[in-house]
Each structure stands twice: as structure tokens, then as C-alpha cells.
Amino acid sequence: FYDARGSALFEDITRLPEYYPTRTEQAIMAAHAPAMAQALGPGRTVIELGAGNCHKARALCTLIQARHYVAVDISEAFMQAAVAGMRQAFAHLPIDAVVADITGDWALPAQVPTARRLVFYPGSSIGNFDPPQAQALLARMRAVLGSDGALLVGVDLVKDAAVLNAAYDDAAGVTAAFNRNLLEHVNRLIGADFDPHQWHHRAFFNAAQSRIEMHLEAAQALEVCWRGGKRCFAQGERIHTENSYKYRVQDFV
């Protein structure tokens, strides 16, 4: 999903009226960030995973008087612009950028302090991993933190299915464009000839699995070719593109 256009489309999604996670998180942070900062203590190195536009870390870095800030994101072009803005806002704060898939092997620059690290993973992106994958990711975070580290992670909770479905299938079609953009990304990566206009966006809450599922559904019978291969899709056949798990507090803890 997260080429430069995918990242930009996701930023658009966060401003949609149907997409409750962003404004809910903003309200939580506005109400409770001072208490969080007091619990965390000053002088921490903030390591933000999936940093995006870096805006979420700004208030936190100010409140805890951050010693160092590291943005980690998979989209290099998008993140470099965001980090440039962060450096303007925090002229005296050491700032580093790491381009990485956080589910793979990645390392922090040598100059990043090892003591009093805070891994900051806001939003609800941990829900994009199935529970075993989420546990593995949390274990990676634990390894990054060290013995005196702390973790601040956002988790989306189970709620009414109508609210969930609307959040991932908005009336303006921005999430649909985000989903279809995956095909453009695949085209560039493997030389495929997916036509995004031949695919419908489908999103729904799977209550049995406690997750939103996003799919792309073939609008007609079609054939897709790529370097060294091809595949036929029947009308109505789906590609399962993303999950977003929703938790109950006791289940996540």
C-alpha cells in the first residue's frame, strides 16, 4: 500500500468524517497526554514506528522534553519531507530517519541513545497484523527498547459493525482509491498490467475473526500478465488485500 501515493491517500483517509480512529486518538491525546508524559518521565528517545507525517510525535516530544527522535517508515519520499518539517519545528532536537519495513530486520543508527527509549506506535496499525504477527512485532519492539524502555501503542477496539464498515468504505471513495492503488504499486514492482478500474473495493467487518477485511473484487473475467507469468481471474473473484483487527482491552493485554 505504502508507496508515496498510498501514503498520501492514507493521510486523506484520516481526514474523512467516517474515519473515526484519527479524531478519537487526537481526543485521547489531548485529554491524557500530560498524564502519559508524567508517567513516562523526561528525556526519552522517541522512536516512532510508521511515522507518516510525524505530526503525532510533536506534542509528545515537547511534553517529555525528548532527548532524540527517530522516525521509522516504509515510504522514503513521504517520510523525508515529514522529517524535514520536524527538523524545522525542533531545531535543537537530534532527529534521524530510518526507511524500513518494521516487520523485517532493521536497525537504528549508531548515534541513537540506547537508554530510556520510548517506542511510539500510534494509530491502529498494529491491527493490520494477525495476532501471532502482532505478538512477534511487539517482541521486536521489546528488543529495541532495552531494559529501561517504554511502549506507547494505539489499539482500535471492537465497536458497532456499521461504524467500522463506514470507516473503511467511505462515501467519497478515498479508501477505495487507496485499496486500488496497491495494483498500481504491484504493476511497478513486477511489471504487471492490472487495470485498477476493473476492480471493485470491498470492505466489511468479519465478526468471527474480529477484523475488518479489505478486498479487491474483479468486475469481470480478466487476465493479468507480469514478467514471466500470468493469471486469470473470474468475475467476482477477490484478492484479500488487508485486515484490521479490532480488540477488546482484555484480549490485547
List the model feature ranges, each with a label.
Residues A115-Q135:
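A short SAM/SAH-binding and catalytic strip from SAM-dependent methyltransferases
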Residues N53-Q65:
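Conserved SAM-binding loop of SAM-dependent methyltransferases across substrates and taxa
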Residues V144-V158:
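Conserved beta-strand signature within the Rossmann-like core of class I S-adenosyl-L-methionine
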Residues L157, V163-V253:
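Substrate-binding/catalytic lobe of Class I Rossmann-like enzymes that use SAM or dcSAM, i.e.
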Residues Q135-S147:
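A short glycine-rich, Lys/Arg-flanked "PGG" loop and its adjoining helix->strand segment in the class I
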Residues S75-E76:
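Conserved SAM/SAH-binding beta-strand->alpha-helix loop
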Residues Y2-G43:
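Class I SAM-dependent methyltransferase Rossmann-like catalytic core
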Residues G43-G52:
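Conserved class I S-adenosyl-L-methionine
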